[in-house]
C-alpha cells in the first residue's frame, strides 16, 4: 500500500458521502454516508472492513458535524495521519474550469460564481470544502468537476438556438454532467480493448437513477445529452428528460401550476416513476413489466427507445461508432435493457451475444456483441471515486 491515502468527499444538500482510498491499488479502506443533515435526526454510517455502524449527529447535524465525526472515526482506526489530500466532487464548474484544480481562494470564488448553474449542489460542495479545510488543516484540497470533461464540445453542440445575448449574459448553454465517470470509462474502455483512446469513436451511456449519454472522439467529449441542467436528455428515474419547453406555459395556464411546481414535477415526479406510477427503481420496473404491469412496461419501453434514439444521434456526433459502452448501475447490471437497446441498433452493425451479455454483470467488464458485429458493445464498470483520487494525488504531488 502507498503511504498516503486520499479522502474523497461528495456533498449533497442534506448528505455527505466519503471514502478513503489507496490511490495505488484503488482499495477503499473506509467509507461513510451522512444523511438527513440539517435535521434533528441527522446521522452518519461508517463502513470499515465490511462492518457498518451508525453515529448520531444530532448535537452537530450539519456538514461540519459530519466531517468532525469522520475525523474521529479515522483517528479510531489510525488512518487520520495517513491522509495526504482531499478530493471533492463539484457538480458545476461552468465555463471556468476544463480540468480538476488545486483549491485556493480564487477557486472557491469560482465555485460560488457557478452557483446559479447548480443551485442545489454547488452551495453544498462549498460547505463540505470549508469543513474539510477547517478540520483537516494543512492538507491540500482538490476539486473535480462533473462538467469539465464536456468543455471540449464544439460550439454547434453546446449552444442553444436562442438569442445569443442569453448565452453571453447568463451562460445559457449545454454543460452536461457525469464528466468524471465518462473520463474514467473512456480510459478504461481503451485499456480493455487494447486500443489508444484517440483512435476510438465511442458512445458511452452512463445509466443510473440519473442517466446521460456522451459522444467521445479523440479521447474528448463531442456532445452529451444533459444540458444546462441534468434534466435534459434521456428518460431517467424521476426526471422527464427531453420535453417541449412549452409545457411550462401549458401547465401554468391549464393546471394552474407555478414554475417551481412544474420544475419539481419534471425533476422529481417524472421519468420511470411518472410513467409507471410505481417506482423510480429500474429493477422494480423490469420485474413488474415482466409480470404484465402496463405502466411498468411502458416506462421500460420508453426508457429503451429514447436511449436507442440517442445512441444513433451520438454516433453522428462521434463521427462514427467503434465502441458502444454501457456503465452506471443500470448500464452495468441490466442485461435486459442492453439486449433490447442493441436490438434497435442492427443498422449500425451491432448484434448481441446473449451469453456474454449475461456474464457482463455485477462488476464484470465484457464485450457483449458477436464477433461479426461492425462495432463492439462493451460493459465497463465506472469508478468516479477512484478518478477523483487519481486527480487529487496528481495535483497534490503525492
UniProtKB/Swiss-Prot annotation:
UniProt pathway annotation: Metabolic intermediate biosynthesis; acetyl-CoA biosynthesis; acetyl-CoA from acetate: step 1/2
Reactions catalysed, as given in the entry: acetate + ATP = acetyl phosphate + ADP
UniProt cofactor note: Mg(2+). Can also accept Mn(2+).
InterPro entries: Ac/propionate_kinase, Aliphatic_acid_kin_short-chain, Aliphatic_acid_kinase_CS, ATPase_NBD
One annotated GO molecular function: acetate kinase activity
Binding-site list for substrate: 89
Residues the entry annotates as binding Mg(2+): 10, 384
Site (Transition state stabilizer): 178, 239
Top-tier EC class: transferase
BP-aspect Gene Ontology terms: acetate metabolic process; acetyl-CoA biosynthetic process
Cofactor: Mg(2+); Mn(2+)
EC number: 2.7.2.1
Keyword Metal-binding in annotation: yes
PROSITE patterns per UniProt: ACETATE_KINASE_1 (PS01075), ACETATE_KINASE_2 (PS01076)
Pfam families given in the database record: Acetate_kinase
Complex formation: Homodimer.
Stated family: Belongs to the acetokinase family.
Name of the molecule in the record: Acetate kinase 1
Species for this entry: Neisseria meningitidis serogroup A / serotype 4A (strain DSM 15465 / Z2491)
Protein's gene: ackA1
